[in-house]
């Protein structure tokens, strides 16, 4: 997919605190040896997430861009994605061989989605700490994302959440669309997410890890 229209673009959305930035960090560090990668983050009035990725050493700083969306962060990934598209274009001009661009949305609700013009694949991250009813509430992120990530499964016993209920509800709401349960703090489930991106996106490693 990265050959005929530029790099594969993966949009990562989800509520504040669900683990979007942690997933961005892990994907960059796990895939950068095999693929040419850039990362773009969205924040309302700051570039905190981009700065976190720089401090973490996810990628070299010139491969990380922060977009300050202002106002409503949903608009910058959906109705008017021009700022993000410009950031992608700038990365492509700096790194013509890009295979993959990861785009993290600003903190958004269950109704936020990525424009097909901006993201080829969408991943939506929710977390167990928000309650086991989240999958049953639906919304485009839950029902229509290409991959749903149910993160922080290690917290289930502490917040009284049933992983079985979340599993059942996710299957009911998503039908044939896949989901994965993760503990990104320990990289549990990360391999499945990477495998999904590679298979769905048609990525071919340029070099061995």
UniProtKB/Swiss-Prot annotation:
Q: Which SUPFAM superfamilies match?
A: P-loop containing nucleoside triphosphate hydrolases (SSF52540)
The molecular function GO annotations come to: GTP binding; GTPase activity; nickel cation binding
Keyword terms of this UniProt record: Chaperone, Cytoplasm, GTP-binding, Nickel insertion, Nucleotide-binding
Primary localization class, coarse? cytoplasm
What GO biological process terms does the UniProt entry carry, in alphabetical order?
urea catabolic process
List residues traversing the bilayer: none
Which InterPro entries does the entry link to? CobW/HypB/UreG_nucleotide-bd, P-loop_NTPase, UreG
**A cellular component annotation (GO) from this entry:** cytoplasm
Compartment list: Cytoplasm
Residue positions annotated to bind GTP are: 14-21
Q: What superkingdom does the record give? A: Bacteria
Q: Name one Pfam family in it.
A: cobW
For this chain, the family text in UniProt reads: Belongs to the SIMIBI class G3E GTPase family. UreG subfamily.
Subunit description: Homodimer. UreD, UreF and UreG form a complex that acts as a GTP-hydrolysis-dependent molecular chaperone, activating the urease apoprotein by helping to assemble the nickel containing metallocenter of UreC. The UreE protein probably delivers the nickel.
Function of the protein: Facilitates the functional incorporation of the urease nickel metallocenter. This process requires GTP hydrolysis, probably effectuated by UreG.
Q: What is this protein called?
A: Urease accessory protein UreG
Q: Which organism was this protein described from?
A: Rhodopseudomonas palustris (strain TIE-1)
């Amino acid at each position: 997919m990265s050959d005929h229209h530029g790099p594969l673009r993966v949009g990562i959305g989800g509520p504040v605190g669900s683990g979007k930035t942690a997933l961005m960090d892990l994907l960059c560090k796990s895939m950068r040896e095999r693929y040419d990668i850039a990362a773009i983050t969205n924040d309302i009035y700051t570039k905190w997430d981009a700065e976190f990725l720089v401090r973490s050493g996810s990628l070299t700083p010139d491969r990380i861009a922060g977009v300050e969306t202002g106002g409503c962060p949903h608009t910058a990934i959906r109705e008017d994605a021009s700022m993000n598209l410009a950031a992608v274009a700038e990365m492509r001009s700096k790194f013509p061989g890009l295979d993959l661009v990861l785009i993290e949305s600003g903190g958004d609700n269950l109704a936020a989605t990525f424009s097909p013009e901006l993201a080829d694949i969408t991943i939506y991250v929710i977390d167990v700490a928000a309650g086991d009813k989240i999958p049953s509430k639906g919304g485009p992120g839950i029902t229509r994302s290409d991959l749903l990530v149910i993160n922080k499964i290690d917290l289930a016993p502490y917040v009284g959440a049933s992983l079985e209920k979340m599993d059942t509800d996710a299957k009911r709401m998503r039908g044939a669309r896949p989901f994965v349960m993760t503990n990104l703090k320990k990289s549990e489930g990360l391999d499945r997410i990477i495998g999904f991106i590679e298979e769905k996106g048609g990525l071919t490693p340029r070099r061995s890890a």
